[in-house]
């Protein structure tokens, strides 16, 4: 953290001290290895002398028994709480009155006034007054802590000075998201895959990773819970962990209205570092690209997974009107060239007029003539008003034995 000073006068009666408050760390321990079965006992004797000098009773552990204060200004990461102690010291031989301290934090986009209780106080000679201030860091990039001091001497002269402390803020984690839509799922479910990477230089433990959905969706977390679920939440530097969420429409009776929705929700993450310092981040609103279904959408509602050869079976289908106008639809069936599955239902059947955001159900009778995995194709839908044709192939696969 670099420091700059701006004074209204070169002779100041007060001095300003700013110290960042951070948690200590365990002192590293230089272990001494010796052979426990050494017949001479020299190694054990030497290890005992080392323990006596270092005041450490255990040399078989990677960390010591003592804590050490931070030796330098360490990195500050987005989502953490920046805590510092600001102290105004009267270094003169006379008292000063009406001492007021103002602390501001300036970023590239805003200037935040931090709460400070040092206002209109009197500081006697060689005395001081200060306060601990905390602020949650919500932006990355260069930050400037501005501390301004106003006071008055006993002779009535108004004095003023301020100090600037610059420090950078980095990203502790990197979040990448991917959206998946099940094309054959009429419920308009959306799957979100979130990849979280530890971009800091220290270990972190993910306490919570949740998806706060928008008002149109409800969310279900899909995670694999093993015998030790906490182990997978520990992220070392550059480690990546994946999370999967399923978002389902709240209004199950109008799933077609969800096809144009792009706002999904926000990811909310919280973690702790190796010494228990807490961090929290929330992403901006996640946006997905709405899938394009065209004017009509065909889905298979019910079909057997396995059938016997030369035994007919039925496939239940549902046709949605995804357009903004009514459609007059007709069903035509084309037999595939390989004829491994023969559709026995009549062709040219009228499905009637279908209003917007509505659906119509129909069934297909299929006769399998060859074994293996066979695909159902040849479904043709015609809008008799506009003469537009919609082709649907490979709508389902059946195993014929």
UniProtKB/Swiss-Prot annotation:
- What is the official name of this protein in its record? Probable trafficking protein particle complex subunit 13 homolog
The record's listing under InterPro entries reads: TRAPPC13, TRAPPC13_C, TRAPPC13_M, TRAPPC13_N
- Species annotation: Caenorhabditis briggsae
The organism that produces this protein has a lineage beginning with:
Eukaryota, Metazoa, Ecdysozoa, Nematoda, Chromadorea
Write out the similarity annotation: Belongs to the TRAPPC13 family.
Annotated Gene Ontology cellular component terms: TRAPPIII protein complex
Source domain of life is Eukaryota
Cite the Pfam families for this sequence.
TRAPPC13_C, TRAPPC13_M, TRAPPC13_N
């Amino acid at each position: 953290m670099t420091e700059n000073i701006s004074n209204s006068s070169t002779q100041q009666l007060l001095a300003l001290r700013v110290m960042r408050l951070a948690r200590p760390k365990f002192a590293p321990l230089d272990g001494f290895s010796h052979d426990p079965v050494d017949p001479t006992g020299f190694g054990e004797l030497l290890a005992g002398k080392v323990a006596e000098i270092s005041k450490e009773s255990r040399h078989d552990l990677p960390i010591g028994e003592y804590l050490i204060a931070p030796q330098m200004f360490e990195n500050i990461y987005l989502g953490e709480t920046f805590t510092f102690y600001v102290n105004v010291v009267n270094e003169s031989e006379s008292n000063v009155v009406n001492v007021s301290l103002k602390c501001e934090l300036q970023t590239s986009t805003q200037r935040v006034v931090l709460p400070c209780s040092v206002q209109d106080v009197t500081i006697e000679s060689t005395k001081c007054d200060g306060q601990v201030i905390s602020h949650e860091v919500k932006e990355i990039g260069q930050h400037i802590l501005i501390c301004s001091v106003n006071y008055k001497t006993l002779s009535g002269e108004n004095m003023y000075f301020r100090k600037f402390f610059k420090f950078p803020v980095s990203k502790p984690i990197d979040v990448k998201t991917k959206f998946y839509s099940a094309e054959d799922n009429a419920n308009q479910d959306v799957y979100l895959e979130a990849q979280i990477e530890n971009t800091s230089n220290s270990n972190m433990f993910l306490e919570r990773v949740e998806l706060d959905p928008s008002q149109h969706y409800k969310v279900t977390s899909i995670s694999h819970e093993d015998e030790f679920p906490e182990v997978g939440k520990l992220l070392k530097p550059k480690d990546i962990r994946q999370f999967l969420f399923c978002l389902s429409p709240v209004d199950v009776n109008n799933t077609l209205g969800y096809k144009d929705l792009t706002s999904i929700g926000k990811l909310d993450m919280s973690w702790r570092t190796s010494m228990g310092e807490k961090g929290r981040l929330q992403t901006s609103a996640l946006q997905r690209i709405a899938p394009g279904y065209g004017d009509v959408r065909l889905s298979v509602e019910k079909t057997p997974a396995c059938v016997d050869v030369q035994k007919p079976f039925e496939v239940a289908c549902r046709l949605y009107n995804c357009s903004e106008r009514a459609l007059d639809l007709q069903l035509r069936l084309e037999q595939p060239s390989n004829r491994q599955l023969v559709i026995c239902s009549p062709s040219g059947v009228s499905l009637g007029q279908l209003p917007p955001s509505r659906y119509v159900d129909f069934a297909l009778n299929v006769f399998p003539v060859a074994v293996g995995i066979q695909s159902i194709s040849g479904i043709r839908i015609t809008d008799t008003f506009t003469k537009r044709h919609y082709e649907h192939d490979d709508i389902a696969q059946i195993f014929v034995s």
